[in-house]
Amino acid sequence: TVANLDSIATLLRCSGVDIVALQEADGPSFWSGNFNHVDYLADNGAFSQSVQGMHVNGLGLSYGTALMANLALRDPKAITFDPSLSPVPKGFTVSTVSWPGSPGTDVDIVSVHLDFASKSIRRQQADELIEAVRRRGRPVIIMGDFNTGWEENSTVQHISRALSLTAYSPEEAGLETFPTFGERLDWILVSPGLSFRSYHVLPDPVSDHRSVIAEVVLEDTAKATRLD
């Protein structure tokens, strides 16, 4: 509803984040009320830039992953995972940003949504993501709904190991993002040379998942960017 979008926009404005990653972000469709929810959030959340990938299109539905930012989003790309893997398509959106205060330092930002039902499908989707990140060849921050926790051999561990990424205190209690089952399904992963200055799961019930806000530092300059 518009009221819920307004609540999200208010939360984003108050948080002061530089970059936002969205999953199940609606475009214009019968289901969404025939307007683009990402454009609405960008306008009302005070973000100058947005990119969106529609991974589901049809039957009155149009939604996918998206990024919003107050930094220039360059070299954008949206990839829908192999549709033969799952009846409900998932995918990711990626763009490049220049790190604030550090000219010449480019970082890829990814918003990803993995399958909710099957570990084997998540693993295959993860391999598509890993290959795409490697091809782009930049440091990366991956944010999104991985639909899995940090258990041994989970998909989020697989991605982290394959790309040498770090998660914030992956086994710490109190960072659950899916309160219905008390699970941590939403993650932020960062490349070497980047580190977390702060990390919070917000209590605001703006969706069935809780929002995550992190402040990420470029280690050699201590220049920080706030992410949601």
Language model regions located:
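Surface polyanion/phosphate-binding segment centered on an Asp-His-Pro turn
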Residues: I142-M143, G149, S211-D228
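Beta-strand-turn-beta hairpins that frame and shape the catalytic cleft
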Residues: L61-Y63, A69-D75, P87-S111, L194, ...
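N-terminal, active-site-proximal structural segment of metallo-dependent hydrolase catalytic domains
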Residues: T1-N44, N57-L59, D127, L218-D228
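His/acidic metal-ligating clusters that form di-metal
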Residues: G91-V110, S120-G144, W150-I159
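Active site of divalent-metal-dependent phosphoester/diester hydrolases
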Residues: S29-N34, Q49-A69, S86-V88, N147-I213
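Sec-exported extracytoplasmic/periplasmic mature domains
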Residues: R13-V17, A42-F47, L73, E131-R138, ...
